[in-house]
Each structure stands twice: as structure tokens, then as C-alpha cells.
Amino acid sequence: MDKDYFTMRAYLYNVTSDSDVPFKLNDLANIWFCTSKNAKRKLHHYQAKGVLQYQPGLGRGNLSHIAFKEPLEKEVLLVLKKSLAEDSFSDILFLLQLPIPKNWFSNISTEIQQMFGLQLTENQQEVLRSIIRRKLTTLDPLQTSVSMESFILTQISDSLVKYDEIDKKVVSHIAHHWHVTEDYKEWTFYLRKSILFHHGRILDSEDVKFTLLRAMQPNTVPFWQLQDIKNIHCTNKFTVTITLNNADPFFIRYLCSPNLAILPRDVTFDEFKLIASGPFKMVERNDECLILEAFDTYFLKRPILDRVEFWTAENHHTLKTIPMQFTSVDYEENSAYVERRKTGVGVNFICFNGHKNGVAQHKAFREAMYHLLDAQITSQELFENYGTIASNYYPEKSIIPTKHPEKIATLLKKANYQGEKVIFGTTQHPTALQESKWICDRAAKFGIHLEEKLVSHDDASYSSVTEDDLDLMMMGEIPAADGELAYLDFLNNPNLLPQHLFSPEVIKEISTKSNEFKLEKDASKRDALQTKMDNWLTKNFHLIYLHHPEKSQSLHSMIRGVTENPFGYFDLSKVWIETLPTKTAKSNYK
């Protein structure tokens, strides 16, 4: 399929639905990301194929014209039917995302739906094919700070040990046992002897050392967790000892993170050909899809699903009728799917910029924003499934805070706020845009001029926003299974928003309080220290918690074995299908 041709047709259809269309050559060059000269060549090529007549504009300022041979709807449906017959998912998703009328697809919507969700191939392979609404960022374990990417890493890689969320303790994984000295400075791990990487080599202690040394480089996500490592010694092929400069009872908890997934030392790292040792192996990754297959020689139980496919589709409005395994669907049109909701998945918050000169530096202004940001009112006026009101990082510790909007005027006067523009950052997620607009409108009622600044998902997740760009930012955080480590990471991870926006003075205080927290061996005392640290941040209004979101996923009714993954998704390695799907998909793999 010629995607450039249909990109042009959809673009011009939104100018006019007539078959004869006036246009500027430069506009086509822009949508094709080419020069005007190359755009003209393309048009002559299409004219030679007989699909259009091209009439260049004569004289400066005169528009060119195209006369199409066939209506766009007819051409789209012809190509779509061909793509369905060939199981060409890439072409189908491309057509569905074009800015063209949705009702064109109504007669074949059932066939389109059946291509996604659960599939059975001709050679009895069970496939879960799903759609994600954005391109993946990075799958480099040392760089990812996003829940979806971290979830995928747990499916294709393994950490040295794991954290059991139910029993609240570290359990064996790659390491079957470990020993730590009384001073918590020397940690020895004993590795299983038959773990294979995806490329066939046995995992050994040198791979553990290689992974940790790579992670100890500056500018990695886990760098802050490993700064105390003094030495890594491979005693033998399956024993490794890590010596620390200072006592750290928390050290083993870091090793549970997917950011410290053990990678092979003999393969140059390539996140598009990622080799690890997890239950699934990566067989294809590009901007359109990520395809995983079960790793037959996985050292634990082999996944029952044979293949998992993630297809990227960023135009969610056109795709509401297609099963989105990890988000919501139109349940009226997808009766085989059921909704699965979970409350308290992470926390949404606002963080103030401690680097930029301006009114946000004034505690009184931040307090005024605290009283203005009433999540109870937001929930009542805006969201049906807003989740629960937040006053702490943890849902179980949150209470409904008391807000006093009558104090706002006095606080603004104390901050000497004169109605100047305050830059308010938000991501481009639809619910974030909805909430940020509500916040801006509410602020205006109190005389606060918030100017919304849209920040891309990548920039927001990896702190790529420059410190001069905004005064405050709204963001969400989805923690891993280990709640204590998640909180430490939230405040200390250099890729996350707090470390990027907090002033050096606040960061220094966080570091001191975090160290005190890590050295405390008693869980109840650590809990009290967390509350104390969180209260210090919120009472000084360095950050304001909004709500703990409610997460919705669509699950096919035939899926069984669903267990919660730390990042709010279900563990693909444990999923199985009770009744085989009625549709047989073509097999394009062995």
C-alpha cells in the first residue's frame, strides 16, 4: 500500500470532498516531509499510474489542482479489504488512523475487530494481539522511567531477586540464595546454574558484574542506588559478592528493579534487538509494533501464550471499536470483552519549580494553589472515574484534605502576586488536558493567570523540560511493587519530575531524610519516617497531591490466569485461554 498516496488523499479530503481539489504544492511537501520538487515528482508518478490528473498552478500565487479518478471511500475500502485478506496489520492500522469518516468502516468493523485480541494461528499458536496508544519510549533498563515500558521489561528480562508484594519481602529469582554480613556492607549472591539468555548462553556471575558496572555510570536511572558500591567480585562462575562503602540494609531491594535486569556481557546492547533471559523474547520492534514470543527454555515456567503483539495506534478516536487489551474499549461493540478496574494506581500531583525566579518560589503562592486545587470539586464537576482523593503518596495513607479557598486572596497578596502569567505544564494525555483546563479556569476565578504549556510524554517522563520553561507541572506516578522503594525512587530518581524541579536545598533535605529512612531496619519506624518526609514536602507546598487514579483495562472474557503486574498491568507470562478463539489467524512465524 502506498501510504503517501492515502496521506495526501485524506489531507485533501479535509479541504474538500470534491474529486477536483485546489491545493498548494508546498502543503503536500510538508505532509510528505520532502521538498516541493520531490512532491511534484510524486504527483507526476501518480498521474502516470492513472489515479489522478495533476494540473500545476500557472503564475505566482495560483493554486494547483488535482482531479481524482475514484472517490476516496472506494479506494480506502478496496485497500482495506485486501489488507484484511493478507492480515496486514500495519496497513489496516494506518488506514484506521487517517482523518476520514469513521462510518466508512462500519460494514467491515467486525472483521477488523476479529484481527485483534485473542487469536489462534493455523499451527495452533495462541496469540494476544493488542494496541497501545503511543510509541514506546526507551526499553533500555538503565533509562526507562515509564510504567508501560517497565512492565514490558518484566516480561522480557529478569532481575537478580524479586520483591513479593503480598508478603512484603525479597524472594529468590536468578539468585537462589544470598548472604549479607551483619554490617550490611557485603552481599553475596548464589546464582542458579541453568539460566539461559535468549541467544542461548548460560547466565553467570560475570553478567551480573557487567550489568551492575554498566548501571553505575552517571546519568542512569539506578545510578543513585549504586553509588556506595566499592567492589564487585566474581568468586566463581555462579557466585558474586558486592561490597559497599557504607551500610545499606535497603541495597537488596534495589536489585529487584527491572532497571537492573541482568543482561549478557557478550552482546552489544541494542534496545531494538534486546537480549535478556525473561519469559518472552523480543522478535521484532519498530515504530509500528513490538512482537514478543514465548522463550521455550525459560528457567521457570514457560508462558502459555505463544506470542504477544503490541501495535502502535496514536489516533485513539478512530480506534474506539477495536479491543485495546491494556486500556478501555467500546463494550457495546466488543461484547467478548469485560472491564477490569483498579483504584489507587499511583498518584497524580503538582510539583513546583524551585529553580525559576518567579511567584512559584513564594510559599504563600504555593499555599494559595493548594487551597485552589480541590480534588473533591474536580471529581464532582469533571470526572466520573476520578479515583480517590490524595494527600499522601500512598492511597492507604491519604485522607480528604481540608481546603480553605477563602484564604486564597490573602495568600496571593502576601506573595505580592500581581496577576502575572504563571506557566503550568501538563502532558498531552486526554484526561490530563481535561483536568489542566479545569484547573486553569478555576485559577482564573481567583485572579491567577495560568498559561497552559503542553509537554510531550517523552519530555515529561524523562525530565527533558528545561528549568526555565515552566513554574509548575502536573504529572502522574505509577509505582512498582515495592512501595517503599517506589517512594524513594519517586523522590531520588534523576529522570523523574521532583529531582528535576526541586531546588538544591529541597533535594539536600530529601537526601538526608532518604538516608535516614534506608538505614532504619524496623518497618514500622520506616513507615513513620515516610509520613514525616511526605508531610514536610506537602506542608511546605513543594508538591501537591491531587488524586489516586482509577485504572481501566479491557480483558477478553476467555483470558484466565490474570495476576497483577507491579506496574498496574497483568502478567502476560501467567495468562492462558480457557476456550480457543473462533477465528484462525494466519501464521507468520515458526
Predicted features along the sequence, with ranges:
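Aromatic- and charge-enriched surface segment that lines or borders ligand/interaction sites
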Residues: 18-20, 42, 145-147, 177-219
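N-terminal lobe/hinge region of extracytoplasmic solute-binding protein
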Residues: 131-180, 588
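Surface-exposed binding/hinge segments that line
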Residues: 223-265, 284
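Append "and occasionally in soluble cytosolic enzymes with long acidic Gly/Pro-rich linkers
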Residues: 361-441
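Periplasmic binding protein-like
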Residues: 448-492
